[in-house]
Amino acid sequence: MFKSGFVTIVGRPNVGKSTLLNAIMKEKLSIVSCRPQTTRNNIQTILTEDNYQLVFVDTPGIHKPKHKLGEYMVKSASDAMKDVDLVLFLINPDEKPGRGDLFIIEQLKEVKVPVFLVLNKIDENPQEKVAETLKTYSELMEFQEIIPISALKGKNVDLLKELMFKYIPEGPQYYPEDMIIDQNERFIVAEIVREKALRLLSEEVPHGIAVEILQMKKNEKGTYHIEGNILCEKNSHKPIIIGKGGSKLKKISQYARQDIEAFLQSKVYIRLWVKVKEEWRDNQSLLKELGYKKMK
């Protein structure tokens, strides 16, 4: 008997959805940063074992939108809860249910498939706090399973996979067994660069950073030559991203190159520039160019 199913992971921004996905896959697949809302596109990640296949939809955190990009991210997360076989609602024990959590719960009550409550970061919180959070959420709605985990340390991740297998239906293998992600290489490369920029810039530059890959060519020796722009919204942000004597941009390129080489399994040369595009997050045509779906 072979089983297959689509699983979506939902939760507030920065709750650890991408970290959980990486722990399940044991590979770095989704942009992870300490900054909220760093996952912007629904990334379908495929886990294939001998007797099952799980297709994960890693979504942006649900939050109140402040611009067109925010509207896209919220719609993207909401749409992902439709037409799936299982929903994982990820929370942190050290945070009481806020407006964002209550908003998600109201949506989950309308879902016709099993919903798991997954408590992340249990290694960072005392058992009493975890138990208190469990009780609070259990009173808000009924969950098919409640699983405490540590996505970062991998604790109880195998148990979570076993429970997911239990709930998904019998079905075909939708993707080839060697396929682990359904996004193209350019998208992944852009996300890796953006992650490094977010990490290195910390709070120096607001969240309005995007990356566009201008060129990505592979020569006869198998080496990739990549060129791209880091987009920011204000002229004042440009020198911050570049850094003194180009030091910050050089570090972004260096750290990104290491991860891109691991992803592509090839040597990589990468050149990055910084370009100002004011209010790009409200520019519908530019959002489309960067791979974000058109809002209806």
UniProtKB/Swiss-Prot annotation:
Protein's gene: era
Organism encoding this protein: Clostridium botulinum (strain Kyoto / Type A2)
Protein name (database record): GTPase Era
Binding positions for GTP per the UniProt entry: 11-18, 58-62, 120-123
Ranges where the record places region G2: 37-41
Residue ranges of the region described as G3: 58-61
Annotated localization: Cytoplasm; Cell membrane
A GO MF label: small ribosomal subunit rRNA binding
Domain Era-type G: 3-170
NCBIfam families given in the database record: era, PRK00089.1, small_GTP
One of the record's GO cellular component terms: plasma membrane
